[in-house]
Amino acid sequence: MSKLKDTLKKLWRNEPKNLGNLHQDKTGILKHREWRGISDTAYDYYRWLITWKDIIVMAGKAPVSTVKGLMSYRWMASYLSAPAWVDRHTEGLRGPQLRITHLHMNGLVKPTTDIINFLLANDKHFHKNSKWSDRTVNVDEIFSSEIMAGFPNLKDNHVSTIPIFLTSMVDQQITPPYLDITEGYGVPADVCPLPSAEAGVAINDDYPMVGKCAITCNMPCDGSVMNSAYIDRRFNIPTHVLNVPLRYNGEDVQPYAVDEVKSMIEFIEEQTGEKFDWNAFFAAMENYNEQLEYEIQKWEINKTDYPQMTGATFWLYRLFYFHISGGMDERFLKIDKKVNKLMLDAYKKQTKCSKEMRHRAIVWSCPANYYTSLANWLENCWGVNVVMDMETMISYIQYDTSDKEKALETYAKTLQRTTMRKHTKGGYANVVDELWRIVDEYNADMVIMYDQISCKGMDGLVGIFDDQARERGISFIWVPQDLMDPRTISRRDMRENINKYMTTVLQEEPVDPTLVDFDDTMAW
C-alpha cells in the first residue's frame, strides 16, 4: 500500500533529475518540456501559454507598429524568446516555488509587453504626431520612478531598459552587435559593456523616439555618465542632470540631494506645463510602502531554516518593480499578495525550496545580464540556495505620506541606494561590512562574488574579501563575468569556475551530474 502511495505521489509531483538532458547542445533549446508530475507540469504549461498570450496581445494592440518595430530594431525580435527565458528560471522547481517564480516572472513579462506597446505606438520614427510622446519624460534605466507619481498626466520612459538592459537578460546574443558598433565608433573595448552597449543602440538609432524632455544622472558610474552624451545627442531634447551624492551615508549631503530633486521637479514642470500633484504622489507612496512591507516579509522568511524564495527571480522581480512601478502600478501589489500567501503557507509546512539544500549563499556584486539564471543552475546542480543578493537589498526606506519635505528627503535617499549603486558607492562599509552583516543575518556559509572584469569597482578589495572570508570560515567563490558580453567570459566559463571550487576545495559531488558541463554558447 505504501508503495502505491509513493508511486501516486511521484506521478502527481516528482523530484527533478537529469535536467541537463532536457536541452539540445549549444542552442539550449528544450527537446521537450520538463515532466514535473501531473500537477506541476499542467501548471507550468498553463503559465507558458499565459506568457505567449501576453506577447500576442501586445502585437494585437498595435500590429502595424509591432511589425515596424521588428523590421527596424535589432533588439525587438529578442523578446520573442521570452518564454524560453522564463523556462530557464523555473527549471527544476516544484510546488509553491514553481508558482511563486511564475507569478514573479509574469510580473516582468506583462508590464514589459505594455511598455513595448507604448513605445512603438508613440515612436516618432513611425508616428510623427504621437499623442503621448510629448507627454513623456525620459529617464535613465536605474532611475527610481516614484517622483513621476506626482505627475499623473505624464509617463516616464526608462530609455535603455527595453532596447538593451532587459533585452540582454532575455537574449545573450543581442548585446555583442551593439558593442561592436560602439567600438567601431572609436570607444575603447575595455569600457563597461553596459554603457558601451547603450551607446551602440544610440549610434545605430535603435531607440524609439519618445519624450518631451529627459532626466539624466551620475548613476551608477562614470561610464554611464559618458554614455549620457550619446543618448542626449540622439534624442536632442531638453535634458536636466540630476546629481546624486556619492558619499551618501552622512546627513550633511542630504540638503544638497533634496535641492537636486526640487530642481528636477521644476524642470519637468517647465518643460511639460504640468504641476506636481502631492495628493497623487502620496497615494502612490502608500502603495509603495505596502509593497515594501511585503518585500521585507520575504526577506525575513529567507533568514529562517526554511527559505521559500531562492534562485534569480527574487532579485529580477525586485529590480524591475523598484525602478518601473514607483507605487503607481498596482499589479505588482496584487502579485505580492498572492506570492506572500503562497510563501507563508509553504513556510508553515516547512517546505523545502529545492531537492537538496546543502549551502546557504549570498550573491554579491553586479550579476551578469547574460546569465540571470545562474542561481537556478547553482541550486539544481550543486544544492546551493541563494537566500539573498546585492541587487535585492537596494533602498527599503518607507515614505512619510504626510510631510512633503520628509517625502522628498526619502526620495533623495532612495536614489542614492538604487541598483548597482547602494553597495558600490559611499565607501568601504557599504560593500564589505554590509556583506558580512547580511551573511550573519541570513546564516550563510557561502558567498558567490561576481568579478565584473570591465569594472574597477571591486578591484581594490579582492584581498580584503578573501582574508575576511577565511577568518569567518565562509566559502568564497569568485565568478568572473563581463556583465553584457558573453564572448569574453561565457556562461560555461562561469559555471566552470564554480565547478572547480565545489570539486577541489569542498570536494562535493553534484546533485545533478548532467548539469555540471554543457555548451550553451548559441543559446538565447
Whereabouts are the PLM-identified features?
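Extended, charge-rich low-complexity interaction segments
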Residues: 193-205, 266-286, 413-436, 440, ...
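Hydrophobic alpha/beta core scaffold segments
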Residues: 142, 372, 376-388, 403-414, ...
